[in-house]
A protein has these predicted regions:
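Hydrophobic ligand-binding cavity/cleft-lining segments
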Residues: 1-45
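A general secondary-structure signal for short beta-strands and their flanking turns/coil
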Residues: 3-7, 51, 84, 93
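Generic serine detector
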Residues: 8, 27, 32, 41, ...
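Glycine-rich portal/gate segments that line the openings of hydrophobic small-molecule binding cavities
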Residues: 13, 32-36, 40-86, 111-114
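Hydrophobic pocket/interface hotspot
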Residues: 21-25, 31, 54, 67, ...
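Beta-strand/loop substructures that line and gate deep hydrophobic ligand-binding cavities in soluble
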Residues: 74-127
Length: 127
């Protein structure tokens, strides 16, 4: 894999309960909405579960993702192709945290910041 090893960990406040955050992170329909303009391809429309494989793409960059672990307050994804590494989400009432580590040519910190901002916007009342 070409690129540099990068590590980023961000935590933000969100106007939502833990259940609402989880729902946005494990529903393929919700993920596709708030991660736009990324294109997501899921095997079905069921909630993510351990072992679920899916693909995301942004322009020519494709990232294969596999759900490594999931519970009521944590989601861990193994990443390959455009990013070789992992992303871990954890959350609680009023906050969400994302840790992203991997080798990539992409600026992962910028990607992660934009992703968290989009999630924060999607969790605002009325969204």
């Amino acid at each position: 894999m070409l690129g540099n090893f990068q590590r980023s960990e961000l935590r933000i406040e969100v106007p939502a309960a833990a259940k609402a955050i989880r729902d946005r992170l494990v529903s393929p329909t919700d993920l596709s909405k708030w991660l736009f303009p990324q294109q997501l391809s899921f095997p079905n429309n069921e909630a993510l579960a351990t072992g679920t494989k899916f693909q995301s793409s942004l322009g020519p960059v494709i990232v294969e993702q596999v759900v490594d672990y999931i519970d009521d307050c944590c989601l861990r994804l193994r990443l390959s192709q455009g990013i070789d590494g992992y992303q871990e989400w954890s959350w609680g009432d009023g906050w969400v945290q994302s840790r992203l580590e991997g080798i990539s040519l992409l600026p992962l910190n910028l990607y992660q910041t934009a992703t968290l901002f989009r999630l924060q916007q999607a969790l605002k009342p009325g969204e």
